[in-house]
Amino acid sequence: MVSKPRTEWSTVLSHLVLAGVSLHAAVSSVQSSRGAAAGFLLQTFAAIIMLAPGPSTHEDCLAGAWVATVIGLPLLAFDFHWVNGDRSSANLLLGGGMVLAVAGDHLGPEGCSVAGQAVLLVVAVTILIVAVFTANTYGMWGGTLLGVAGLLSRLEEDRLLLLPKEDVCRWALAAGSWAYCRALHTQRLQWE
């Protein structure tokens, strides 16, 4: 069993910020959107598990982060679509994420990587589309930042802005999650 590699300060900080933003978003959205709160909570656990010392392997942590991506992100988008009356897209996103989570063992490492990035981009684009049509500025920012995180993860470079690429992606994901939490709040205020 290979234990988790040592991490540098930027990696630890990006995980902590993502966990903090996601936990705050989960707590603030639990009353109005349980699906989104569950998605934010999955992101929180995935970020914390990557840092937690213990017997878990790096591969186990990556598998947990992958499941948080393919189930957690569709859960975030589910409520955004559902409240706007787009129930078929909401169900399709969530159902697709569940199928991918179950099929993860059969995809292999490269397949899981592509599937995770595809889910991230699909969720980002669908949030962006709904936000544009409902004039939800936070939703537009959230969708854009989630998309940026997905696109940055596809780059071949190891470092961006003097930081490891994965850290920059986590920062973008944290900013997108914060904006998306605000978008959910704005959306709820519009419908009340």
Curated annotation (Swiss-Prot):
Bilayer topology annotation: Multi-pass membrane protein
Locations listed in the record: Membrane
GO cellular component term of the entry, any: membrane
Signal peptide residues on this chain, from the entry's feature table: 1-32
Keywords: Membrane, Signal, Transmembrane, Transmembrane helix
Source species, domain of life: Eukaryota
Transmembrane segments: 35-55, 63-83, 92-112, 114-134
Keyword hit for Chloroplast: no
Protein name in the entry: Transmembrane protein 276
Species of provenance: Mus musculus
